[in-house]
C-alpha cells in the first residue's frame, strides 16, 4: 500500500537521494511561491519558502532574446530565471537611458546660474561687448584705431613736408621738373600713396591682406610678394591707397601692430627706379 506524507516532519525524515526533498513551486494569482530545502551552517535541514510577485513589462528585443538563451553547466536543467544554488543576486542597479536633448537640458541645469560666462572684449567686464558702457569711448580698441587713423590723415594733409615723414621726390621743391624729365622714361606710376608692409607670415594671403587694410580706406592696388616655387609669402607686400591720408593712417595704425603672432612694420614705399 502506498504511503502518503502528511506533515513537514515526515518530509524531513523521508529518505531522499541527496538527503533533501525536491523543491516545488506553484502560482496563485499574481504571486509565485517557491519552496526549497537546504542545510544551514549547523548542518540541519531547513525549509525556505520564497514569494515572488509576478509583473508583466515590455522589454527590448535584445533582453527578450537573452532570456531565451540555453543554460549550460550546473544550470543546464534549470528553469527560466535565476537559481539560488548557482546565481547570487547582488544589489539591484537601476539604469535610465535618456536622449541627447534630455541630456543637454540636464547639463544646463548643472551650470552655476550665478556665474556669468560673458566677457567684454572692450573692458573685460562680465557682460557682452554690445552692452558695454564704454563702447565708443577711448577704451574701445576699434574707436582708438579710427582716432589714430583720422589724426594721421589730418597731419598728412596739413603738413606733408613735416620732418620725419617721407615725402616723394616729385612733391619736393623742383620735383615737378624731375618728374617731367622722367615722364618719358616710363615712370608714370604714382607711389605717393603706396605703403610697404613687411614682417608678414608665410601663410599670408591676398584675402588676409584685404581684410587687414580695407577698414582704413579704399585702395587701388595690392601686391603680395610670393616665392616662385613654394608659393609662400616672402614676408612683405605693397598697398596703393586711393588717398594719401589713408596711406598715412595705415602707417600710423598698422606699424607695430601685432598680426598672426608677428609685429608688422609699415612704412612709405620707396620710389622704384
From Swiss-Prot:
GO cellular component: eukaryotic 43S preinitiation complex; eukaryotic 48S preinitiation complex; eukaryotic translation initiation factor 3 complex
Sequence ranges assigned to domain RRM in this UniProt record: 193-271
Protein's GO biological process: formation of cytoplasmic translation initiation complex
InterPro entries the UniProt entry points to: eIF3_g (IPR017334), eIF3g_N (IPR024675), eIF3G_RRM (IPR034240), Nucleotide-bd_a/b_plait_sf (IPR012677), RBD_domain_sf (IPR035979), RRM_dom (IPR000504)
SMART domains, A to Z: RRM
Stored CDD domains: eIF3G, RRM_eIF3G_like
Keywords, sorted A to Z: Cytoplasm, Initiation factor, Protein biosynthesis, RNA-binding
Pfam families: eIF3g, RRM_1
Keyword check for Cytoplasm: yes
Location in the cell: Cytoplasm
SUPFAM superfamilies: RNA-binding domain, RBD (SSF54928)
GO molecular function: RNA binding; translation initiation factor activity
Function of the molecule: RNA-binding component of the eukaryotic translation initiation factor 3 (eIF-3) complex, which is involved in protein synthesis of a specialized repertoire of mRNAs and, together with other initiation factors, stimulates binding of mRNA and methionyl-tRNAi to the 40S ribosome. The eIF-3 complex specifically targets and initiates translation of a subset of mRNAs involved in cell proliferation. This subunit can bind 18S rRNA.
Self-association state and partner proteins as the record states: Component of the eukaryotic translation initiation factor 3 (eIF-3) complex. The eIF-3 complex interacts with pix.
Similarity-based family: Belongs to the eIF-3 subunit G family.
The protein, known as: Eukaryotic translation initiation factor 3 subunit G-2
